[in-house]
Amino acid sequence: MKSVNRLGLLSFVMWGLAAPALAQTQANPTGNRPTSYPYVTFGIDSFLQYAAELHEQDGYNAFDLTRGYFKIHAQLTDRVGVRFVPDVRPITDASLDRNLALRLEYASLDVQATERTQVMFGLHETPWLTFEESVNRYRVLGPLFAERLALIPGATDLGASVKVTGERTQVHVGVYNGEGYGRAELDKYKSIDGRATFRPFSDDSELGKVTISGFYQYGWYAKDRPRNVAIVMGSYENERLLGTVQYLSATDNPFVAVDVKRRGLSFFGEGRQGPTGWAGIFGLDVFVPDVSIDNDTRRRYLFGGAHWTEAGTGRFGVVVSLVQEYGSASSQLLSRRLQAQTLIEF
């Protein structure tokens, strides 16, 4: 009963934030936006790749589509919009066949309740992964650290959230089913996700390009089976350099009788000519899947290069990389993969 009351109170608060926006219409359109409502815009994100296994796997190699977004955004008023994004991506079915499947990535109502407050309801972004993608433009390489480890179930989920943006801060908090990517809810348990991001230094200094972010997910697989994840990340970015360092701590219990504590560190760096042109990239992930087991540390290295082109609001990138993964036992090589990937976005 307490859970129902809390959810009811949350719904009431979010409706209160959204109500002023629902009543407001556009008075002075700016920029290139249409002068009347509603209007609809379209866009595409496409990740294509060729990947070759260089260690064991019998030389397996394949061309693949790893993301195919068709982005539809309907703006009903200057403050109320609807986002609908189907996604084509590879899945493995029950017979272990790998096929391309169509599923929904976004289906949400977005309300700009005030100048700095956004309310989102439905299948929409969760606080961490979409934010991390906005910092690191190399999502084309594959899932980011926490998602790759299956600690965060997806970049989108069904739920409701509020995002507040200040001059040097941003806070995003939401309640979600916790299954990820619109999967059906399996039980009564929900996930509460929250992120706070701030720039501790003045914008007019070089240190003003430093950003600190913290994230916490408080969730459950089922009764007495927690899925709690804490992440702290620092990033620095200027025209020619991007660097991120991330620490992850998780208490996880997907299948076993006891909680498993996991730890991880992730580093990523990019040296570049600028927003367009040539770039070199490096990544290192260190992950301890169970801190109770001695000498059980996994390492993942990434080396590569890229070239980026922009045209209007569109972007095209080509990325070539080598990814190697090692186990802790005598630094045993687990996998080595060569990847050539393209990103098309407009």
Describe the function of each predicted region.
Residues M1-N28:
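Cleavable N-terminal export/targeting peptides
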Residues K2-S3, D64, N136, F145, ...:
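Short alpha-helical segments used as structural interaction elements across diverse proteins
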Residues V4-G8, Y69, H73, L302, ...:
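Residue-level detector of intrinsically disordered/flexible regions characterized by low predicted structural confidence
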Residues A19-A21, V119, A160, G194, ...:
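Active-site-proximal helix/loop capping residues that flank conserved catalytic or ligand/cofactor
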Residues A27-G180, L186-D193, T197-E206, F268-I281, ...:
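Outer membrane beta-barrel
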Residues F47-G59, T77, A94-D97, A107-Q112, ...:
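Outer-membrane beta-barrel pore domains
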